[in-house]
């Protein structure tokens, strides 16, 4: 390591902490990959493989992609089942003293994608976790882009296989006996060939730590309230899932707000062969949606609705009371053409609120996402009004549970301009008049010279020093220059910085404040 250049030493320090990830290492306007990562990515994405001096006799293999278009390349790699670690520059290279500080700002794996460009809006993107002993198993599924989590336990591996077939996760965490169980591994390789499998240590599933994580992130004090006290292996699986997210996607944990526990008997059990033969969501031959039951029934007008009807088809209701209640709701909507049509028109205007909120929680949203959320929220009063016209128990329940979120809508509309830039660094996204300090900083940025001249004139009048000047250098920032002949007139609130041959430089607190801004 000692013979490597400082930059390569930094690269290996970061890479050694992320050995299972392809490391996108920011260098100027590019994300670069080195050594084996570079060879693999150049082959997978058909990129030119070059080299870079690294302090050793042989040049380091290297390939790269422009940072502004990196998401497209990352999406292709994630789709192929690779895990990505994005290493960003943490300071301006022009201002850095020595080597630029860098660190991992984001990790992307097939089961933890939140970027809209990498997701199919019509289906959930699940991360699964399976924990098993020889007799018992627990399994859970999380879509961190929407915040929904399902969990159950069982004593039968057939149930585990059926659930994996139903949810079709992109990534599977495995612990305990599941890691070495040949039939489990064979099922995944044959039936879920696109899924990435991550073996995990037993300590990640330890019961007390798992229970504490569940209490912390799902805000559950008493497991008896939702039945978790009777689902011990579901607790193990949830603990392993949360442990993985803590280590790789800590920001995602704030968005997991919808834990749904279920038992096998709540839904009709369909094994993989039945699902395939019935062509519920994909055809046997082409694996496409067209020609399936979902293709016929999915006449939804929102991405959220499209995902929901897929879930309904994948998980047919089993309880006759629940089936009848849903049928009555559908019948009520069909019978009232006027209100149904009006409701449909409003729903067409609703953006994907689940994933918008997810991106906001994880810090990957842009300003237009905020405006899109406000626009979607603005539709809620009309939606609730039209639903209230239906005299049916399920629709009434939906109506009562709609939170209009007016405070959130008002905050966004008051703070963000109507047509904001996509990138934060472009500026101009906060409305004038919303925040006094931001308005002042904006004034300094756009008309700073005029304000400095005004301050200079004010200080001349206040001190009686006619030749007082305001200057600037990189060491002190803005400063006030006063000649030696006028040193007696310098006020007490000026702080001496250095003495010149013909006078002194002083800096008062107002000027210092502007420099810091």
Question: Model regions: which residues?
Answer:
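Short terminal or interdomain "cap/linker" segment that borders an active site or interface and mediates
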Residues: 492, 501-517
């Amino acid at each position: 390591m000692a013979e490597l250049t400082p930059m390569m030493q930094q690269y290996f320090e970061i890479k050694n902490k992320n050995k299972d990830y392809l490391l996108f290492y920011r260098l100027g306007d590019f994300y670069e990959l080195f050594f084996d990562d570079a060879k693999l990515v150049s082959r997978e994405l058909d990129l030119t493989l070059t080299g870079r001096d690294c302090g050793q006799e042989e040049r380091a293999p290297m390939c790269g992609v422009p940072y502004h278009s990196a998401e497209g390349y990352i999406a292709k790699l994630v789709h192929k089942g690779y895990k990505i670690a994005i290493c960003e520059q943490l300071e301006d290279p022009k201002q850095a003293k020595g080597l630029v500080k860098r660190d991992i700002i984001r990790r992307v794996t097939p089961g933890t994608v939140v970027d809209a460009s990498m997701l199919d809006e019509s289906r959930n993107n699940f991360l699964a976790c399976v924990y098993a002993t020889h007799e018992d198993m627990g399994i859970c599924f999380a879509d961190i882009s929407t915040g929904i989590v399902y969990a159950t336990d069982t004593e039968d591996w057939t149930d585990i296989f059926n659930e994996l077939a139903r949810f079709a996760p992109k990534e599977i965490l495995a612990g305990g006996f599941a890691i070495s169980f040949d039939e489990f591994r064979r099922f995944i390789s044959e039936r879920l060939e696109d899924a990435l499998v991550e073996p995990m240590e037993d300590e990640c599933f330890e019961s007390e730590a798992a229970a504490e994580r569940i209490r912390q992130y799902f805000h559950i004090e008493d497991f008896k309230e939702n039945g978790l006290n009777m689902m011990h292996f579901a607790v193990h699986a949830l603990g392993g899932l949360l442990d993985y997210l803590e280590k790789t996607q800590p920001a995602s944990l704030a968005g997991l707000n919808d834990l749904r526990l279920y038992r096998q008997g709540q839904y009709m059990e369909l094994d993989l062969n039945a699902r395939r033969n019935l062509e519920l969501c994909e055809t046997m031959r082409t694996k496409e949606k067209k020609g399936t039951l979902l293709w016929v029934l999915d006449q939804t007008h929102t991405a959220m609705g499209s995902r929901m009807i897929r879930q309904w088809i994948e998980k047919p209701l089993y309880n006759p009371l629940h089936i009848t209640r849903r049928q009555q709701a559908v019948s009520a909507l069909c019978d009232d053409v006027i209100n149904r049509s009006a409701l449909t028109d409003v729903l067409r205007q609703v953006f994907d609120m689940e994933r918008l909120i997810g991106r906001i929680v994880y810090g990957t949203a842009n300003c237009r996402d905020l405006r899109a959320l406000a626009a979607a929220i603005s539709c809620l009063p009309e939606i609730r009004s039209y639903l209230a016209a239906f005299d049916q128990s399920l629709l009434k329940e939906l109506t009562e549970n709609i939170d209009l979120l007016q405070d959130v809508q008002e905050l966004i509309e008051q703070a963000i301009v109507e047509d904001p830039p996509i990138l934060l660094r472009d500026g101009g996204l906060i409305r004038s008049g919303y925040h006094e300090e931001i308005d002042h900083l904006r004034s300094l940025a756009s008309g700073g010279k005029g304000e400095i001249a005004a301050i200079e004139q004010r200080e001349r009048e206040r001190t009686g020093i006619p030749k007082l000047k305001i200057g600037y250098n990189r060491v002190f920032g803005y400063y006030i220059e006063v000649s030696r002949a006028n040193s007696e007139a310098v006020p007490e609130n000026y702080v001496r910085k250095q003495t010149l041959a013909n006078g002194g430089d002083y800096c008062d607190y107002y000027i210092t404040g502007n420099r810091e801004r």
